[in-house]
Every structure is written in structure tokens, then in C-alpha cells.
Amino acid sequence: MVEVFDWLSKQVYSFGIAEFNHMEGPFAVFEALGIENTFDVSASIFYPEHLQFLGIDVKLLNVPEFKFAIPGDWLNNEGLLNKESKRYRENSLVNEVTNRNLALIHSRTDLFAFDSFYNEGNVKDLRVPSSVDLLFKKVKFHFVNQPFHAKFKEFPISENILYIGGILVEQNKILIEEKVKANDNEPICVILLTFGTVNPIGGFDLKSIAKMFEEFEKHSHCLFKVRLNKFVPENYNINIIEVTDEILPQKEILSKENTKLFISHCGLNSLTEAIYAGVPLICIPCNGDQFYLSSLVEQMGIGIYIKLNISNQNEVDSEVFGADFQNALDKMLIDSNIYQKTINELRTKILLDLEENGPKKNIFLKKISEVIGK
């Protein structure tokens, strides 16, 4: 370890860049190497519990705790819209608990670092790193993989948080151009269903998928392009439901005028692509930031959030899911529905921002150049 550090310390650095959400360690290394210009680049959102390290109390904001968001939070007075509601008070309490737990984890990390240096003496002449909280505060900018126009209404604007969501979409170009017209032999309505590459079947079991396919078959004017690793019922209408276990050309499908709906886990990359494409969503999250982002979709009015109710036997309540999905799909397939109108307006706003301020990649590189003076 000493030899590695000695080699690293002889190099010249302009800046250090890493992701803080899950790996604080690199920022301690940056400090030990004397790197003052540090940047945090997150593949996800800016976590609400990290606001406390910027001096912002998330409990005072109408923002759901990362894992606490549920369907309906933004649809009635029993949810987060009403600051007198039980749900609002519960969310505030959970935000407080999450804040304290993160602070506790950081303090334990600090103690571990202290013990490591003083009890084991694994690196000579190297001072103990600053606390994790201080390392976070030293970060010049936090770049997050989220569009600026796709965040909760009360999520605070901070000069330290820069939104570069869409950087890959803009480089690919297909979703920032005019929508592609469908050919005469193509269906007037295409529905895309895919739950990403990590867990292609999401949190579904066979019964819940069968319920979903039953609803698909009620809309015979549409073609449903489905990726579910062939984890499907034995009998279904293959004329309107195309199932594959291969990765679908998601951007290309979303770019078409006849694509009316995206049924997704609503991970950040899929959500961003849907927004740039102007395609409304039915969100059925499974893990990670998907619950938080599904709630965001609901608040923005660009889709519907359905949560799978899992029993103690690890089975989905297929009857409840079937009813929820039927209601959501029927709403989405109404001509000129409000979700389509709202996401069209959001797409227009994002593309106008791109035209006026330039690609996110340029903004990202320009901001780093400004900090390092090059």
C-alpha cells in the first residue's frame, strides 16, 4: 500500500472525479493526494438525505424519502399534497430517520478510518482523512444523471448540483429529432414493455404477467412489444403480443410516432429516454431509485405509478395488480389523454433548453474547465 501511495503522490492531478453515493473512499484518496478540485458524478439522482450536507433540511420540503414513495402520493389530500395528512407526517419522520442513519454510517466510517491509521499504521506519514461529511462538502459540483426539468417541484435548486441527465440521449440524437412517422403497414398503436437489462422480469410472477396479458388482448388495435425473457403464459394472442428475450431497440421504438406508451420499471435511463421521446409511462418499479422516480412521474403528470404488492410467500397480489393495471392501461389508451399532452409539453421544454443552452456534455466539460482554470 505504501508503494502504491508513493507512486500516486508523485503524479500531477488537475482534478479527481468519482461517484459519492456508494463510494466515499476515492474522495479520501483525492484529499490525501492534495487534489482540491473534486467532482461527484452520479448515475442516479441526488439522494434527498445528502441535502443535509449542503445545509438543506429535506424534512421541510415536500420530497418523498428515497424508498418511501407510494402510488397516490400526489393525487389526493391523503398523500403528500396535504401537509396536515398522516402520510405527510410519516414521510417527514422517515426522512429524519434516513438522515440520522446516514450520519451514523458516516461517523462509523470516520471511526474505522481513524482506527485503521492509528492502530494498524498501514501508511506512514499520511494524515487521517477528513470526515465523510466534510469530504462531501469539499466537492465542487455534484453532477447527476437527471434532467433539470424532471425533478420534484420542491426539490431545492443548489449551485452545487448540476443536472446532466440526457447526455447520452443527446449524443445518440434519435430522440432529439422529429418523431419518425410509421409506415403504412405498421399498426397505429405500439406499446413497449421492458424492465431494463439487470432484472428483465422486474418483480413479476407468472400470475401477474398473465393478468397483464389479459388486458393487452382487450386492445387489439395495438401491438405490444414485450421483453420478458419468455417468462410468459402458455397461451396468448401472438398477433398483438410480440415476446422476446433479446434486448429491444428501445430508443428506436420510442422515437416512432405510433409508440403510445412505455411500460417500464422507470429506472433513470429509461425515464429520461421516455421524456426526450415524449412517450408517457406506466411505472412498475422493482428496486433502487425506481420507486422514487415512479413517484416523480406521478407528480409531473406524465404517467401512472403501480406498485406490486408482494405477500409473505413472495407472490404478487395478482388480483389487485390486475385491477390497477386495467385502470392504468385504459387511461393511457384514450386518444389525446392528459398524460400524452403533459409529456409532449415537457419534451418541448427540454428540447428548447437544449437549443438555448447546448448539449449536456458541453455543459459538463465547460463547468469542469472553469473550476480547474483550463
Task: Give the predicted meaning of each segment.
Residues 18, 246-297:
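A donor-sugar binding/catalytic signature common to diverse glycosyltransferases
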Residues 313-338:
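C-terminal "capping" alpha-helix adjacent to the active site of nucleotide-linked donor transferases
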Residues 223-229:
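Short internal beta-strands
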Residues 241, 281, 299-316:
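A short acidic/histidine/glycine-rich donor-binding loop in glycosyltransferase catalytic cores
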Residues 42, 165, 265-266, 284-287, ...:
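Short beta->alpha connector loops at strand-helix junctions that form conserved
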Residues 1-221, 232-238, 312-313, 326-327, ...:
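Nucleotide-sugar-dependent glycosyltransferase catalytic domains
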Residues 203, 235-236, 271-276, 283, ...:
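Extended hydrophobic-aromatic, low-complexity segments
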Residues 37-38, 224, 281, 304:
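Hydrophobic beta-strand scaffold residues
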